[in-house]
């Protein structure tokens, strides 16, 4: 018995889910100024006689519909008293999907929208969408059924940027504040001191520098070598006279 109840609950839940998912009318979020398509659709194997789009959380809501699409008369805009432009277009050839187009969305468009879809020629094959019972043999098999779905349009306001204030200075010298003299950076003109051209910003190595470097190495290197050898010899005891040692 428990298994039967669970199975029945699963079947009822699946049927309810099928009811709620039959009409697709999904939420949309867009920035102000963007082009927005509010698409309401049902499966293409359904037969649609009328699709009505309106403002509000529930159908009607005391407001006129925005747009109506019918399978035989095409589409037309009623605008429902709103002062903004709309376009309604069939999306597919089977006339089971329409898009309400808002070319320049503003904060006035934000809110809930409803989509009422009227199905026609309901049959046993799609009987789960129709009001009928298996024991009835009447026109209720073919009765029209209206399904409703709602969505919410969220409009993100445009970011406002504060205007830049430009301050223009007059050329009059009577009110010009006194400015302290600013020391200027030395120019990049090289200074010549004798045979050595000196540029403090871009020093360049000349032949004079190389010649002085070679002379310095030639003079200083032997002197340093002699000093180093002498120090090593002194540390090693060279030249010291040892006891018992008589030089020849």
UniProtKB/Swiss-Prot annotation:
Xref: Pfam families: V-set
Main location as per UniProt: membrane
Boundaries of every Ig-like domain copy: 19-125
InterPro entries: Ig-like_dom (IPR007110), Ig-like_dom_sf (IPR036179), Ig-like_fold (IPR013783), Ig_sub (IPR003599), Ig_V-set (IPR013106)
Membrane topology reported for the UniProt record: Single-pass membrane protein
SUPFAM superfamilies to which the protein is assigned, alphabetical: Immunoglobulin
Leader sequence segment: 1-17
Subcellular location: Membrane
Gene Ontology cellular component terms for the protein in this record: membrane
Disulfide bonds: 40-115
Positions annotated with a glycan in the UniProt record: 27, 37, 45, 73, 83, 92, 95, 104, 116, 121, 131, 144
Record region (Disordered): 167-191
Chain intervals with Basic residues compositional bias: 175-188
Transmembrane segments: 210-230
Keywords from the named record: Disulfide bond, Glycoprotein, Immunoglobulin domain, Late protein, Membrane, Signal, Transmembrane, Transmembrane helix
Family: Belongs to the Epstein-Barr virus BILF2 protein family.
Protein name: Glycoprotein BILF2
Protein's organism: Epstein-Barr virus (strain B95-8)
């Amino acid at each position: 018995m428990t298994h039967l109840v669970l199975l029945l609950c699963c079947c009822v839940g699946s049927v309810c889910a099928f009811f709620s998912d039959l009409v697709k009318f999904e939420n949309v979020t867009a920035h102000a100024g963007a082009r927005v398509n509010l698409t309401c659709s049902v499966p293409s194997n359904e037969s649609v006689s009328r699709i009505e789009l309106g403002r509000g959380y529930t159908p009607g809501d005391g407001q006129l519909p925005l747009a109506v699409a019918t399978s035989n008369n095409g589409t037309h805009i009623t605008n429902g008293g709103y002062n903004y432009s709309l376009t309604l277009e069939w999306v597919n050839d089977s006339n089971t999907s329409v898009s309400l187009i808002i070319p320049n969305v503003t904060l006035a468009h934000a809110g809930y929208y409803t989509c009422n879809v009227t199905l026609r020629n309901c049959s046993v094959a799609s009987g789960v969408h129709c009001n009928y019972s298996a024991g009835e043999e009447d026109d209720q098999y073919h009765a029209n059924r209206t399904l409703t779905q709602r969505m919410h349009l969220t409009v993100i306001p445009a970011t406002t940027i504060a205007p830049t204030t430009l301050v223009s200075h007059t050329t009059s010298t009577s009110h010009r504040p006194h400015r302290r003299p600013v020391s200027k950076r030395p120019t990049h003109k090289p200074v010549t001191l004798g045979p050595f051209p000196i540029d403090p910003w871009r020093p360049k190595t000349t032949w004079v520098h190389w010649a002085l470097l070679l002379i310095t190495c030639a003079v200083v290197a032997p002197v340093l070598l002699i000093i180093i050898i002498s120090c090593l010899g002194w540390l090693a005891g060279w030249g010291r006279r040892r006891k018992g040692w008589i030089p020849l």
